Regions:
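Hydrophobic anchor at the beta1->P-loop junction of P-loop NTPases
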Residues: 5
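P-loop (Walker A) phosphate-binding loop of NTP-binding proteins
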Residues: 8
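ATP-binding Walker
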Residues: 11
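Walker A/P-loop
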Residues: 14
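Conserved substrate/cofactor phosphate-moiety recognition/catalytic segment
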Residues: 18, 22-62
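NTP-dependent small-molecule kinase module
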Residues: 19, 23, 74, 99, ...
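Glycine-rich phosphate-binding loop used to anchor ATP phosphates in small-molecule kinases
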Residues: 55-99, 103
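A glycine- and Lys/Arg-enriched "phosphate-lid" helix/loop adjacent to the NTP-binding pocket
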Residues: 97-147
Length: 184
């Protein structure tokens, strides 16, 4: 089984995904990290080489296809980018019969987890001013509005990020007969 987590940036896809995978005994993949490993460059630099976001997703979907089709680790959890249910990604996920789960949280909680990176994907520590916090709250809300229609197309579109309670996802999947009894 392939479980794919989607949501806006910093909603907790990687953190929850790692914990969920560990609990289930599944492999974990962060699609952004896999894309960077595959192409040998940061996502920002890769995007700058391509004409549009669409062409980036077209190229990046090849990495997702490899993850979904790989047989060495048939059970895995994959953290997708916010655009993870759009065009090329959506086709790959549909062909791979993946279970997709959209994670949500309040913009204020997401802002508390916000992380910044340089062009080479190295984390940058940044203390935000009140004006910057207000700006990023607006940006997070705008992302939630923009990506919301795609996230609502996920298999299970409204699982909230509750203080890292990945057990909520397990209970939800069991309740919908997605996890068989053998899963912890």
């Amino acid at each position: 089984m392939k479980i794919c987590l989607v949501g806006v940036s910093c909603v907790g896809k990687t953190t929850m995904g790692k914990r969920l995978a560990e609990r289930l005994g599944y492999a974990f993949f962060d699609l952004d990290a896999e894309i960077e490993d595959t192409f040998g460059t940061s996502i920002e630099r890769l995007k700058s080489e391509l004409l549009t976001e669409y062409s980036f997703r077209q190229k990046a979907a090849l990495v997702l296809k490899r993850l979904v089709r790989q047989q060495e680790k048939p059970h895995c959890v994959v953290a997708l980018p916010p655009s993870g249910l759009m065009d090329h990604y959506a086709r790959v996920l549909k062909q791979g019969a993946c279970v997709t789960i959209a994670l949500y949280d309040r913009p204020e909680n997401i802002l508390a987890r916000i992380t910044f990176y340089d062009k080479d994907s190295h984390p940058i520590h940044k203390a935000l001013s009140a004006a910057e916090k207000a700006y990023y709250l607006r940006e997070i809300t705008a992302d939630m509005t923009y990506f919301g229609p795609w996230h609502r197309k996920s298999s299970y579109p409204k699982i909230r990020h509750v203080c890292g309670d990945f057990a909520q996802i397990i209970r939800f999947l069991r309740r919908h007969d997605v996890l068989w009894p053998m899963a912890p």
